[in-house]
Amino acid sequence: MDIRAEIQTRVDEIEQIIKRYLPAEEGWQKTIMEAMNYSILAGGKRLRPMLMSETYRLFGGKSKVIEPFMAAMEMIHTYSLVHDDLPAMDNDEYRRGKKTTHAVYGEAMGILAGDALLNYAFETAAKAFDMEPDNRNIGKAMQILATKAGIYGMVGGHVSYTHLRAH
């Protein structure tokens, strides 16, 4: 078995899962959807959804109910990168070899795209209820996802980093 080929196969599968959950670029919200999709499709290792999937399987998970959570996890990660790149934070112009979201769509749309990715992540994760409406673990998983992305998780960590950087 070639581990690099196996990892690339998994990354390709995850890319397809993510694409299935992205919003269609249409309607009066088209610009925000374009900015969201631009951000999340800019590449990346897809390590977080890969680890989530493998952990799910390790503990006996077999259904596709994990897939909306995999996409949601990558949306949350991407939102954090979009916001991190903003002028008020790190003011980066490039990420993964491409112009950052705010560099392409403007600062205001960069903020909105990050916000939209975070909210859309929870809309996406909630689609797991459509697959298994009686699965109580979905609610627990959503609670964990929210906590780990929020003030007691990723956002809280970024606040600490911002304070340290300011001093």
Predicted features, each with a name:
Residues 1-76, 82, 89-90, 95-103:
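Conserved N-terminal diphosphate/IPP-binding helix and adjacent helical/loop segment
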Residues 10, 14, 137-144:
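Extended, well-ordered alpha-helical scaffold segments
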Residues 124-141:
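Inter-helical turn/loop segments and adjacent helix faces that build the functional surface
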Residues 51, 121, 157:
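Residue-level signal for inorganic ion chemistry
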Residues 103-122:
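Multi-pass membrane catalytic core of lipid/isoprenoid biosynthesis enzymes
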Residues 140-158:
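Conserved ATP-utilizing enzyme core subdomain
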Residues 162-167:
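Conserved small/polar residues in nucleotide/adenosyl-binding loops
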